Structures are given as C-alpha cells and as structure tokens.
Amino acid sequence: MDYPLGGAYKAGWNLAQEFTNMYIGHGGEFFKPGSAEVSINNAKGVATLEMLKALSAYMNPDFLTHDSNATSAEWKAGNVAMMNMWGSRMGPLMDPEQSTPTVVKTTTLGDPMTVGGGSTPATTLWWDGWTVAKNISDAEAEATFIAMMNGINHKR
C-alpha cells in the first residue's frame, strides 16, 4: 500500500483541528496561565507540527485537499489502512446499507490515539457540549447545569 494513513488534513479548518488534537495530546495549553494570551509557540507546538509533518509522509501526496469526506472515500476505496476519523463518519462506513461488505467487515474502531508516549488522547470534541466555570460556587454550577439541560431539552 503506497499511502497507508488517511487524515482530514485539508488546508484550513480541518488542518487546524488536527493541530488542535495533536497539541492537546502533547499536553499543550492554548493560553498562558491566568491570561487570554495565546501560547502555542512553544516546544509542544513545535513537536505537534513535527508529528503532523511526519505523519504526512504516509499520506496521499494530495493530503492538503483531504477533508473528512475525501478521507472516508479513500477508506472505502481501500487506499488507506488506518485513519483518525470522527465517530459520526465511522457509522456509515460500518453500515451494510451505506458501505460495501468488504469495508463493513474490515472496519473496526480503536481507542483514541495518544502521542509521544503520553496518556492524554490526541483528540478533541468541543462542539457537542458546554463548560461550567470552575471558579463559581457549587450552587451556581448546579444552576448553570440545570439551565443548560433545559436549553437542550427539545420537549420544552
């Protein structure tokens, strides 16, 4: 197999998301402690860029054009053996009604990958959830949680 690794490295949002994933895996912090000052120009940021570059050596030379749709297509075509993909994209690949029998039979899921011998998953999922500030009282945190739960309740 010429290019065994697939990834959503399309220039722009996709590549930025992959940087974010890998940077978190390296234990990177986006801001200097106690401030809103961006802090990614550091050893962990460089290690992240070096890892992304190293992985690209195993990807299709057009990897900077591959978003999750193109990466899924590469998987379906049998052009890649491993990829880091969103869970929502894996369902169709494993569904006999949406994929081929060979793809369904040979597609499995694994634990989130780590990087550099660390134990922090090199992945993020920030768009389906919310956060509660840690510097508030338990009562305020509970009220925030209840308000958010009511906000997502489609029956209301």
What are these regions (language model features)?
Residues 62-77:
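Short helix-initiation/N-cap motifs at beta->coil->alpha
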Residues 15-22, 45-52, 71, 89, ...:
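Stable alpha-helical elements in mature extracytoplasmic
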Residues 7, 66, 84-86:
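Short beta-strand and adjacent tight-turn residues that come in two discontinuous sequence segments
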Residues 81-86, 92-93:
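Paired acidic/hydrophobic, glycine-rich loop segments that form the ligand-binding mouth/hinge
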